[in-house]
UniProtKB/Swiss-Prot annotation:
Modification type 4-hydroxyproline: residues: P59, P60, P65, P70
Native organism: Conus regius (Crown cone)
MF-aspect GO terms: ion channel inhibitor activity; toxin activity
Family per similarity comment: Belongs to the conotoxin M superfamily.
Predominant location: secreted
UniProt name for this protein: Conotoxin reg3a
Length: 73
């Protein structure tokens, strides 16, 4: 009985070697925090026109109700 089991195990290992299985160490590290930060950074990055930089204006979404800048008008 043990010899039959040994033969079966040998055949299975020859047909499907353990090296074919992906190991955790072989996979690139998943970095969801970095992907999220890049997305948030891109979404929060202010988009200035050259004209706005010369005038010293900020983006309209930065203007609050008590803003005294001529750009917030």
């Amino acid at each position: 009985m043990m010899s039959k089991l040994r033969v079966l195990l040998t055949i299975c290992l020859l047909l499907f070697p353990l090296s074919a299985l992906p190991l955790d160490g072989d996979q690139p590290a998943d970095q969801p925090a970095k992907r999220m930060w890049n997305g948030k950074l891109a979404a929060r990055k202010p988009r200035f026109d050259k004209y706005d930089l010369v005038r010293g204006c900020c983006p309209p979404q930065w203007c609050g109700p008590d803003c005294t800048s001529p750009c917030c008008g």
